[in-house]
Curated annotation (Swiss-Prot):
GO process annotations (BP): blood vessel diameter maintenance; negative regulation of blood pressure; proteolysis
Residues bearing attached sugar chains per UniProt: 64, 102, 126, 192, 362
Encoding gene, per UniProt annotation: Scpep1
Family: Belongs to the peptidase S10 family.
Primary location recorded for the protein, binned into one broad class: secreted
Keywords recorded for this protein, A-Z: Carboxypeptidase, Glycoprotein, Hydrolase, Protease, Secreted, Signal
Phylogenetic lineage: Eukaryota, Metazoa, Chordata, Craniata, Vertebrata
Descriptive protein name: Retinoid-inducible serine carboxypeptidase
Function, as annotated: May be involved in vascular wall and kidney homeostasis.
Length: 452
């Protein structure tokens, strides 16, 4: 057993060495990958709408990729790039400095990164009318892409396929999963759809907004007056949502965040133990000052495409991929993606999750302890609104502590699971769980995909 383990480790180091030697000697970022380990392409999902995907085949030294699951990663925003942020900042084989990531998911799954909705990352549209404006369009576009992908890559049709997501990507993942389940049942898409994981997901926006005040107050980041102000604007958001005024609710959501920033001395919405970074020059423009929506875009999209990542994607990566149109820059259309979805932001998707549970689809909810924008209190709140018949039995269970190492005594997370619903409480993590707690995120992925 020990000899087998050592052989696996040696093979892993050889794979890693060959991966790194693929870089040219003259430039640490101009590399050539081993044949067959990566593929990428565009799919025209609608007229004037072109979606980009990038696949990494699993590199486990002891198993063939066909023995491991395929994981599709969906970023948030909307407008955040999976091929960029998800890949180089969270779970891909390399970081933005092109150094190996110790907690990459690639040893345990093949990874499919998709820039979605259209206009995100390297995906692009030819006309402004082609941007997606709602969840239905997002899901429909993804069905076109997935059909094309599985038709062209039949080697993955029988491999367990999971969708993992983050933030607004979770809302999109839920809608996509419902349509994918239908397509698989109807035989229009051939794949072994095995489950969806919703990470710090914007499933019920109003439950998140309503929980911000109590959460911040409990963490000593609001006083009584601040709590009253935040609670007041949260009630306005609730009223707008109840009346179906979703665009108005989005504007009020933006105002709520401004009130929180003022009262907390600039708390970071993605990790409450850090401060927000200084905002850039464009924020002083008249457009910015009069538009809460532009401010939302600044906060929730631009942090997903920092300078280092943008330079990497628009430089060495674009050169490597070779198929990106010359006039397309990574992330250039992200703001338009975000603004086009204005009417969809505050719509709840609890009923979508209920459909998945009723269909028997495995649903995992996971959340970072230090996240504010989608805090755990809000997640727990919408879960309790599910109409799933087994919810009472789920609630009766006691959670189980998880550790990243069997020898460790430090609790890394808690989990509760019953039938096809699981909930993970990830400790010491903010909104981007794999970035903050890479080892625990990897362990969770292995648990969800039944590898532990």
């Amino acid at each position: 057993m020990e000899l087998s383990r050592r052989i696996c480790l040696v093979r892993l180091w050889l794979l890693l060495l060959s991966f790194l030697l693929g870089f040219s000697a003259g430039s640490a970022i101009d590399w050539r990958e081993p044949e067959g380990k990566e593929v990428w392409d565009y799919v025209t999902v609608r007229k004037d709408a072109h979606m980009f995907w990038w696949l990494y085949y699993a590199t486990n030294p002891c198993k063939n990729f066909s023995e491991l699951p395929l994981v599709m990663w969906l970023q948030g925003g909307p407008g955040g790039s999976s091929t960029g942020f998800g890949n180089f900042e969270e779970i891909g084989p390399l970081d933005t400095q092109l150094k190996p990531r110790n907690t990459t998911w690639l040893q345990w799954a093949s990874l499919l990164f998709v820039d979605n909705p259209v206009g995100t990352g390297f995906s692009y549209v030819n006309t402004t009318d082609a941007y997606a404006k709602d969840l239905d369009t997002v899901a429909s576009d993804m069905m076109v892409l997935l059909k094309s992908f599985f038709d062209c890559h039949k080697e993955f049709q029988t491999v367990p396929f999971y969708i993992f997501s983050e933030s607004y990507g979770g809302k999109m993942a839920a809608g996509i999963s419902v349509e994918l389940y239908k397509a698989v049942q109807q035989g229009t898409i051939k794949c072994n759809f095995s489950g969806v994981a919703l990470g710090d997901s914007w499933i019920s926006p109003v439950d998140s907004v309503l929980s911000w005040g109590p959460y911040l107050y409990s963490m000593s980041l609001l006083d009584n007056q601040g709590l009253a102000e935040v609670s007041d604007i949260a009630e306005q958001v609730l009223d707008a949502v109840n009346k179906g005024f979703y665009k108005e609710a989005t504007q009020l959501w933006g105002k709520a965040e401004m009130i929180i920033e003022k009262n907390t001395d600039g708390v970071n919405f993605y990790n409450i133990l850090t401060k927000s970074s200084p905002e850039k020059a464009m924020e002083s423009s008249l457009e910015f000052l009069r538009s809460p929506l532009v401010r939302l875009c600044q906060r929730h999209v631009r942090h997903l495409q920092g300078d280092a990542l943008s330079q990497l994607m628009n430089g060495p990566i674009k050169k490597k991929l070779k198929i990106i149109p010359e006039d397309i820059s990574w992330g250039a259309q992200a703001s338009y993606v975000f603004l086009s979805m204005e009417g969809d932001f505050m719509k709840p998707a609890i009923d979508v999750v209920d459909k998945l549970l009723a269909a028997g689809v495995n649903v995992t909810v996971y959340n970072g302890q230090l996240d504010l924008i989608v805090d755990t209190i809000g997640q727990e709140s919408w879960v309790q609104k599910l109409k799933w018949p087994q919810l009472s039995k789920f609630n009766q269970l006691k959670w189980k502590a998880l550790y990243t190492d069997p020898k460790s005594s430090e609790t890394a997370a808690f989990v509760k699971s019953y039938e096809n619903l699981a909930f993970y409480w990830i400790l010491k993590a903010g909104h981007m769980v794999p970035s903050d707690q890479g080892e625990m995120a990897l362990k969770m992925m292995k648990l969800v995909t039944k590898q532990e």
